[in-house]
Amino acid sequence: MPGPQPSYQNMERFFIRLKAGQSMTLSAALQKHLRTTAEEAEQLLRQGSVWDSERKVRLRDGGMAVTGQLLRVDRPKFKLREFALEEGDVKYEDEQLLIVYKRGGVPVQPTPYSDTDNLLLGVQKYYEEKGIRYRAAPINRLDLPAQGLVFFAKDKTDEAAMNRQFQLHRVRKRYLAATRAFSGVKSSYIIRSDLEWQGSRKAALTYVRFCRENAGRFFFLVFPQTGRTHQIRRHFQAEVAPLLGDVRYGQGAPGADLWLLCFCYSFRHPASGKKTTVSFLPDPWRAAMGKPEVGAGLRPAR
């Protein structure tokens, strides 16, 4: 299962503004006001945790002079590392597409506290190593604590084609989810609701089918028909049971593993137009479920 899951609850935010007439280097300002060492200040700059708050840009140069600008520091409480793809993370690759596995706790793209500890950076480094001259961008997103497959393209045309398939809901997504509780009253659910996020309410639709039970865990196949923020987690909390390890919508302890996996996609290949299916079931999930096969073994329970 995934490792520790950083979150905004594990981040400290500081604002620094020098007094009128004061001037010092950025590194010195960080050391003085955050009471850090020179090495710690350099690490904050290197990992992208320091911002010019008014211009909304990251600051890197510890030797630059700061005077009256408002500085913002988003300091994580956990240790960061510069992300790189590991052997076996690439689950599909051809001349047009790259599909990689994201572990739980790994951001898909830069966060306020870092632009070095994310999947996008790992893919960009992979492109550079392979001589692929294209600026990578994730085509789909996954929640920070969730695991699963993330799409990247290798040129603008294929990226636009895949983005369009996702926007028109022509990509079939299949998830696995696990809970500790399940009433068993019914084996399938059609969950419709309006979900609010940051002041906006949008319709959400999720299909859920009970799959199997093993060792006190109940596993479900999940087919989201829309892509709202935290949609699956919120729908499970409301209609089925909170997901195992869900800190936000359940009773998971801080740092717990969220049992939510995007394991399969079916789509039209942007070059050939052929129906293509890519799936991946990590070994910990396979073991927890009683070692099913990705295809036949993951049919809903009858």
What are these regions (language model features)?
Residues P2-R302:
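RNA pseudouridine synthases
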